[in-house]
């Protein structure tokens, strides 16, 4: 919320690149025999976030994790009986839980299980093997994937193409080789709004600036892509009036 007048183009804050949590800034890339880029933008960031989260106080992003949500009630976490209430809605086919879990178990789960010192088991488990271990691994991966879906930014490179929105799970085949994703501390404090926005940012130093004049007590609204209502519901479980004009008819 603005406390005083803010001019058009005035700098609000700047986030240095090294403060962004990403596959490039995390030390995990130097500890694995795998190339994180092989996992694509979504799964590589999920793996990095699991690693940094499990490091606890040793992670430079520990304070950031403390302000991020730990529990979600978005559609990815609904039970089959709860999802039955949405039968007939197109959103059911866009959740992609099964495909997301298949990708997690086929790609990042072997890395996690092979490196128990980097990824210590949670909840008192001896390992991530077995039914209990697999479920614990899926739970933490879904949590990180949901955080990314709700809060992550695209980190553009000159050679990158524009990234398209995932329609199923956390990643589509078309997304491979496109923009990396990163978690930007402090930027999460800005409300996202598809229409009534007055704050934008410029890569790669994450320079956040106003592009309209502020009056005192006017809230900051971060520029976001215009998304259909079904995708907004899947990511954030909200039905904000700003997105109603972008609903599929």
Which residue stretches match the model-derived regions?
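Short secondary-structure capping/junction motifs at helix and strand boundaries
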Residues: 57-64
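Long, positively charged leader/targeting segments at protein N-termini
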Residues: 1-19, 23-27, 66-212, 216-249
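Short peripheral tails and domain-boundary helices/loops at the edges of structured domains
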Residues: 30-57
């Amino acid at each position: 919320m603005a406390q005083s007048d803010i001019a058009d183009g005035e700098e609000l804050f700047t986030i240095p690149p090294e403060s962004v949590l990403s596959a490039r800034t995390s030390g995990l890339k130097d500890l694995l025999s795998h190339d994180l880029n092989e996992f694509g933008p979504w799964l590589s960031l999920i793996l990095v976030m699991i690693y940094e989260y499990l490091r606890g106080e040793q992670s430079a992003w520990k304070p950031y994790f403390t302000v991020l949500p730990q529990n979600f009630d978005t559609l990815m976490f609904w039970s089959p009986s709860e999802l039955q209430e949405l039968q007939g809605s197109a959103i059911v086919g866009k959740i992609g839980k099964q495909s997301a879990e298949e990708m997690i178990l086929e790609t990042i789960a072997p890395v996690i299980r092979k490196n128990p010192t980097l990824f210590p088991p949670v909840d008192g488990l001896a390992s991530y093997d077995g039914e209990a271990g697999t479920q614990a691994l899926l739970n933490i991966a879904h949590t990180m994937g949901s955080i990314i879906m709700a809060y992550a930014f695209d980190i553009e490179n000159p050679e990158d193409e524009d990234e398209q929105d995932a329609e199923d799970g956390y990643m589509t085949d078309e997304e491979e080789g496109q923009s990396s994703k990163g978690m930007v501390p402090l930027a999460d404090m800005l409300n996202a709004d598809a229409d009534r926005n007055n704050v934008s940012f410029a890569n790669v130093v994450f320079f956040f600036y106003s592009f309209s004049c502020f009056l005192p007590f006017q809230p900051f609204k971060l520029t976001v892509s215009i998304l259909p209502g079904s995708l907004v519901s899947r990511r954030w479980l909200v039905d904000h009036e700003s997105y109603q004009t972008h609903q599929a008819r």
